[in-house]
């Protein structure tokens, strides 16, 4: 029997404990679980972690074979110097599907100009015929598991999709660019810009005033990566001068977004309260169980975090 420590809040423990146990049983693995203090640290085989968990010294888990994150983002833990165990980020089908649906919905909303009809004056019959998707350029920043899935789906709808990442990628139907020197090229054609990048030292304020100025006039931005990707002040300035017509933001530097933040009152900002890619309990439990099964059988862990890259 393996021993799992849930380094999570009591609420998350109640939500995930039984689904993960059931997912493990389907794989013929029996487990004992507990919160910090329930099981001796030196007896723990795996740590299931979420931001805000009470333990931040992972050095006590001398037997632990891996730390398995419940969330896709690991920027809050990756720099922890006591964490010497393999760290795995969450990648699961529900997370991927949720992100694709959110990106497609808001890309189509921007592409079709739906806001003008939702907000139009009563009795105003004003026709605005948008171009077809084949004549609309979309750039996706970040081509990991989620970004690649979104880019592939948008290309399947006919959009002219450019993808940009730190390292070279190949995605059917997507023009892929890589490296800092190709970022201006990726931004220059982005009538709709979709950001799905993680937070790393290289991505903080990636979209600053200088880079926002490279976007085509009247572009739209969707940010479902991390709030730190965009300089808030520079974005508001770009909206005010018409460089950007709308920004749909799912992530923010501080969450929940403070009540006095100017994003709330800006007519060009749509606030989506971090719902683009929520972790689904059942599919996430299967993903955790899959990785534990792999480790128990001696197979390589999936979705290992590269500490040098911070994701």
For each feature predicted by the language model, list its residue ranges:
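N-terminal glycine-/charge-rich "phosphate-binding" loop or analogous flexible N-terminal tail
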Residues: 1-46
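Short acidic low-complexity segments
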Residues: 31-43, 56-57, 174-189
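Phosphate/diphosphate ligand-binding glycine-rich loop within oxidoreductases
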Residues: 45-118
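Short, well-ordered coil/turn residues at beta-beta hairpins
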Residues: 50, 70, 196-199, 224, ...
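Glycine-rich NAD(P)-binding loop of Rossmann-like domains
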Residues: 116-149, 176
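NAD(P)-binding Rossmann-fold cofactor-contacting core
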Residues: 156-173
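Rossmann-like adenosine-cofactor binding region
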Residues: 168-262
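Rossmann-like dinucleotide-binding domain for NAD(H)/NADP(H)
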Residues: 218, 224-311
């Amino acid at each position: 029997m393996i021993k799992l420590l849930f380094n999570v809040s009591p609420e998350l423990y109640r939500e995930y404990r039984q689904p993960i146990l059931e997912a493990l049983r389907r794989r013929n693995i029996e487990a004992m679980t507990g919160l910090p203090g329930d099981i001796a640290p030196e007896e723990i085989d795996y740590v299931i972690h979420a931001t805000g968990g009470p333990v931040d010294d992972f050095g006590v888990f001398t037997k632990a074979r891996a730390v398995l994150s419940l969330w896709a983002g690991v920027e809050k833990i990756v720099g922890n110097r006591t964490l010497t165990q393999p760290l795995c980020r969450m990648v699961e089908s529900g997370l991927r599907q949720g992100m694709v649906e959110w990106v497609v919905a808001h890309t189509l909303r921007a592409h079709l100009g739906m806001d003008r009809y939702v907000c139009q004056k009563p009795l105003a019959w004003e026709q605005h015929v948008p171009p077809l998707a084949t004549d609309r350029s979309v750039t996706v920043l970040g081509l990991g598991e989620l970004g690649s899935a979104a880019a592939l789906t948008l290309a399947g709808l006919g959009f002219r999709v450019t993808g940009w990442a730190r390292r070279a990628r190949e995605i059917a139907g997507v023009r892929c660019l890589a490296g800092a020197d190709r970022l201006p090229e990726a931004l220059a054609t982005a009538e709709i810009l979709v950001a799905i990048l993680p937070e790393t030292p290289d991505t903080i304020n990636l979209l600053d005033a200088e880079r926002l100025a490279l976007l085509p006039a009247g572009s739209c931005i969707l940010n479902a990566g991390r709030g730190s990707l965009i300089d808030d002040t520079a974005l508001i300035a770009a909206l005010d001068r018409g460089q950007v017509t709308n920004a749909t933001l799912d992530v923010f530097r501080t969450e929940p977004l403070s009540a006095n933040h100017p994003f709330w009152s800006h007519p060009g900002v749509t606030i989506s309260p971090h719902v683009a890619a929520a972790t689904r309990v059942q599919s996430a439990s299967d993903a955790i169980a899959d990785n534990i099964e792999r480790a128990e059988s001696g197979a390589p862990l999936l979705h290992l975090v590269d500490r040098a890259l911070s994701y």
